[in-house]
Amino acid sequence: MTQPKRIISNPCLQLKTLASELAECLRSLLIHGGYTINEDDIYISIIYKFHDFKNWKQTDSLYSEKGLETDEVVNNPKTTFSATLNSKNGIIFYNSKQEAFDKGEYIPDNCDKYDSNGKLLGSILCYRIICKKNAIDYITAIISITTYDKTLVSKKAPKSVIDNVKYNIEKHILSAFEKRISIELCLLYLSELNIRKKEMKLVSKSHKKISLKEQEH
């Protein structure tokens, strides 16, 4: 009888690809009235934590040299990450990083740029994903969308336009990508559980060998 084909999955690579596709979708959405933003201007990272695993981790990014270290982002209560993690709606968008900084919800990194008045340039948007079952949060992740020069929406745009862009990003782009990202995070979680299981077996075998040697003596 023919055996079923083995499914080969690389969730880390898939998540990196999804980040690139997300950046392209955002670039297309943000073209408005002659205002454009390049895909390369948008930096996307995904920081996640699995149930029963101690540390937060960051997926492979397209520009890994940018941004704060994961520990800096997670452990500082004044980051947009922390604000989003604890927010009611699970999404925070500042078209102006300076506004986020002034409100104590952004920490500049070494890639941030400033205007002639010393004000931060660019935008920051964070979006929370939770995968749960039976009231247990098995996976928690924050998607961070950052620009370091141009804002996601023109600085001249009224608040109503900015709010509309936020709505469209959340409802028409992030909600769609959330499904794919959640699937890949679940596959990554299962992979990590499998690795942990193998490590525990090796430790158990090692302890048994030590115990047998001690008994022989």
How would you name each of these model-derived features?
Residues 122-132:
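A short, aliphatic-rich beta-strand micro-motif
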Residues 48-120:
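Regulatory sensory and allosteric helical modules in signal-transduction proteins
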Residues 11-31, 77, 159-179:
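Well-ordered, non-membrane alpha-helical segments in soluble/globular domains
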Residues 52-57, 132-138:
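Short, solvent-exposed loop/turn segments that connect beta-strands within catalytic domains
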Residues 136-217:
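Juxtadomain coupling helices with adjacent low-complexity linkers
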Residues 48-50, 131-133, 146-149:
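Short, flexible loop/turn elements at secondary-structure junctions
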